[in-house]
Amino acid sequence: MASTYSTPRWRTALLGGFLTTLPWLSSGMAGKTQADYFIKSLPGAPEPLLKMHAGHIEVDAEHNGNLFFWHYENRHIADRQRTVLWLNGGPGCSSMDGALMEVGPYRVQADGNLHYNNGSWDEFANLLFVDQPVGTGFSYVNTDSYLTELDQMANHMVIFLEKWFGLFPEYEHDDLYIAGESYAGQHIPYIARAIVKRNKEQGKTPWALKGLLIGNGWISPVDQYLSYIPYAYQNGLMKADSDMAKRVENQQRICIKKLEDGGMDAVDTNDCEQIMVNILEETKDRKADRMNQCVNMYDIRLRDDASCGMNWPPDLASVTPYLRRPDVIQALHINPDKKTGWQECNGAVSGHFRAKKSEPSVRFLPELIPEVPTLLFSGDKDFICNHIGTEEMIKNMQWSGGKGFEVTPGVWAPKQDWTFEGEAAGSWQEARNLTYVVFYNSSHMVPFDYPRRTRDMLDRFMGVDIEQIGGVPSDSRIDGEKGPLTSVGDHPNSTRAEEDKATDVKQAEWKAYYRSGQVALVVVVIVAALWGIFLWRSRRRHTKTAYQGDDGDEGRESLLTGMGLDNFRRKERRSDLEAADFDERELDDLDGASKKPGNGYASLGSEKERQSHNDSTFSLGGDSDDEAGSSDGPKRKGGSS
């Protein structure tokens, strides 16, 4: 770390011993203040800079478990303060996907510069991205201490939030929303349940958990497994009664037998995951050019090489080298002793996180919905966590005295048409605290495709009222009705530069923390300072050891034996890397010269360029139909090992 940081750290260390005497600050946070996390500059970012904080918070002192966060302050305040905690899936995939490819204020360009994301979720909400479980992304832990169960992960997140709100108390009373996608369909309900339980404990300041948002979520494994064949038929990937279909249906029978033999409560079942793997393998067109052989499991409109989606999304080719740049690592306050580069998904984390003792979140989601408003959303072109599985799950769930979207016995809430700026955007359906949104012509990562539409969804769900701040609302209608003015129209991202006066007030509040007790407790401070120096030095040595211990697994990720989800797309690439023994940083060159994706990747980059919905919502495009239709002949079987 640059020498300019030495003075603040020395000052922090002197205060460390004194601050540990404060009841709200645990020993793991001794010596840390907001100033240590403040991002003074960010390479490639446009001016003026957004207000951001980033760094590590310790959640497991015994095993040196630290979670990395990146926080953006909201650019405008509507009627109330809100914070959105965003989590990506995997398990073991970094939430920097969400920060730099989906809902965050910046997108990374090919030249390494950042540009504003027109549609970022920080318009009216503070955004908090966390790499979790420990070991994911920039987070770290001793390599013999990866988590294995969902309850462990949820407990770490509660510890993280306790300490984070201790550092940033001005956000503790915000309305809190937890959002994410994919395997976060397990993470989010588990974390929400832990927060609800914590809020009921005596002496705790309740956190205002106001809502959950889960996109293309892995919530009900059974419903997802049994959705693969219907989805393949509905979208022309496979023809009923074909030899291909018979082989895949045989795999489904094996899956059902496994489920009936005790697999109904498993978070992942390998024999059932094989259904999708077999469909992808059977539908490969090996006569096509290399980058157009396989359907992309994350967006069936696209095709990829034999990995069936691991080269997607295309922005990853720019994000990975950006997050490995030394100046970016320094700006984000990453421990300088960390020798391995950022990885989107960590196979060591997912390999340990088998959740064998955990029940699927669908088992208790019906108990959460009455307490916490919940929104599920699906991109209709995603295969791996497709909308059919989500809809089956909703239909089968019972909560608040009804089943599915019943409003009265036997009468279901209507599915409403949603239009955005004159285009058919999707459908809305809601009843008894649950909302379900389908995005037409969208992938596994809906905000990657439609950032502004997802922000409109978020603002509607949060009940944002922009009338107090002015601005022109976007033309968003549900069944033709505009409803409340909830989302601003199309404009480049503004910044909080003009609102720095409020920031100055907050900084003044923290100066008061530093001065607190300095006159009355001078002697205590001096004595405690010596102890703080000792802790500071020993912690630096301890951290260095932990990072070095983590090297063995970074960049050498074996084929997964269970649930893949976001990790699945990198199985083949990681098995190739496992045979090589070289420094992780050499991967920068590999990613910079990565293979070009197949048909459709470049043409789907702009929200305004998406094709509008028509009567054949769930059909493939012309090219994909032809390729899928020609693959009914005998194919080599394969799958994950």
From Swiss-Prot:
Gene Ontology terms describing biological process: apoptotic process; proteolysis
Active site: 182, 382, 444
Record topological domains on the Cytoplasmic side: 537-641
Membrane-spanning parts: 516-536
Reactions accelerated catalytically: Preferential release of a C-terminal arginine or lysine residue
Pfam families: Peptidase_S10 (PF00450)
Cleavable signal peptide: 1-35
Main subcellular localisation: Golgi
Protein name: Pheromone-processing carboxypeptidase KEX1
Disulfide bonds: none
Chain positions carrying an annotated carbohydrate: 118, 433, 441, 493
Species of provenance: Leptosphaeria maculans (strain JN3 / isolate v23.1.3 / race Av1-4-5-6-7-8)
Enzyme nomenclature, EC number: 3.4.16.6
Keyword terms of this UniProt record: Apoptosis, Carboxypeptidase, Glycoprotein, Golgi apparatus, Hydrolase, Membrane, Protease, Signal, Transmembrane, Transmembrane helix
Subcellular location: Golgi apparatus, trans-Golgi network membrane
Lumenal face of the membrane: 36-515
Cellular-component GO terms for this entry: membrane; trans-Golgi network
Gene: KEX1
Its membrane topology: Single-pass type I membrane protein
Family matches, as InterPro entries: AB_hydrolase_fold, Peptidase_S10, Ser_caboxypep_ser_AS
GO molecular function: serine-type carboxypeptidase activity
Function of the protein: Protease with a carboxypeptidase B-like function involved in the C-terminal processing of the lysine and arginine residues from protein precursors. Promotes cell fusion and is involved in the programmed cell death.
Family indicated by similarity: Belongs to the peptidase S10 family.
Region (Disordered): 472-502, 585-641
